Amino acid sequence: MEESQNGVKYGGDATDAKEYFTIQPRSLQNCDLKDIERKTKFAHLQNYRTNYPEMGMCLIINNKNFHSSNMAVRNGTDVDALKLHETFTGLGYEVMVCNDQKSSDIIGRLKKISEEDHSKRSSFVCAILSHGEEDGSICGVDVPIHIKNLTDLFRGDRCKTLVGKPKIFFIQACRGTELDSGIETDSCSEPREEIQRIPVEADFLYAYSTVPGYCSWRDKMDGSWFIQSLCKMIKLYGSHLELIQILTCVNHMVALDFETFHAKKQIPCVVSMLTKSFYFFK
């Protein structure tokens, strides 16, 4: 239903919930403190390589209509998908948008991409726009699927050509049914070369539109707070800030610049297993 304020009509806000004993590491054995300090002194300055021939694939799963499951239509999601397509095309990604996907379709598309040769690509990006559940599932247009079933396809032991490269997932979906009422605040304004083994769960980043247990807001005309803020911050800062800094700006924008007519708030949640800084430019 449209809402109005001071005579101006708005598309209204909606949510994306589904209705309603240790061994000393070998690297430290026979290693003195100075050696450790030498190895780690400049670790925080290391960046992921982006000078590959291609930036990589960007898959956008845009689920709007849920006819078989009786969940609400996600009006405004097409605005998000279009903005994401524009943003990541501008960054040099090969973008694929898939609309109204069943859970089996989502798994199939991601499995196919995980089996591709990514040797000439710097990263992989996936954005999922859908309803979500409190247990961490996202919804196909038919049934839910846990996000881990999707991201596990890109683990280092399964997708060899993306080992050591960023695998970035943006999730626009509710993670529960709680509503955030907010609170007022008082405020003023060189290591030697060696072969390394990488944990299979390394180099993933998950950027969720909201924290566990809470709803995620989407304007029915303008798109979701999270995706619109993400695209805006990438446009403003993607040419000089690294990804975590950009996502911090996204958190700031969503937390402070948005509010529903009923004074409800939202804060995105970033879970990072990245091991270096990632920039969207070469």
Curated annotation (Swiss-Prot):
The active site is at residues 131, 174. It catalyses: Strict requirement for an Asp residue at positions P1 and P4. It has a preferred cleavage sequence of Asp-Xaa-Xaa-Asp-|- with a hydrophobic amino-acid residue at P2 and a hydrophilic amino-acid residue at P3, although Val or Ala are also accepted at this position. GO terms for biological process: apoptotic process; erythrocyte differentiation; execution phase of apoptosis; keratinocyte differentiation; neuron differentiation; positive regulation of neuron apoptotic process; proteolysis. It is an enzyme of class 3 (hydrolase). Keywords: Apoptosis, Cytoplasm, Hydrolase, Protease, Thiol protease, Zymogen. It is found in: Cytoplasm. CDD domains: CASc. One of its GO terms (cellular component) is death-inducing signaling complex. GO terms for molecular function: cysteine-type endopeptidase activity; endopeptidase activity; enzyme activator activity. The keyword Phosphoprotein does not apply. Important mediator of apoptosis. At the onset of apoptosis, it proteolytically cleaves poly(ADP-ribose) polymerase PARP1 at a '216-Asp-|-Gly-217' bond. PANTHER family: CASPASE, CASPASE-3. Heterotetramer that consists of two anti-parallel arranged heterodimers, each one formed by a 17 kDa (p17) and a 12 kDa (p12) subunit. This is Caspase-3. The gene is casp3.
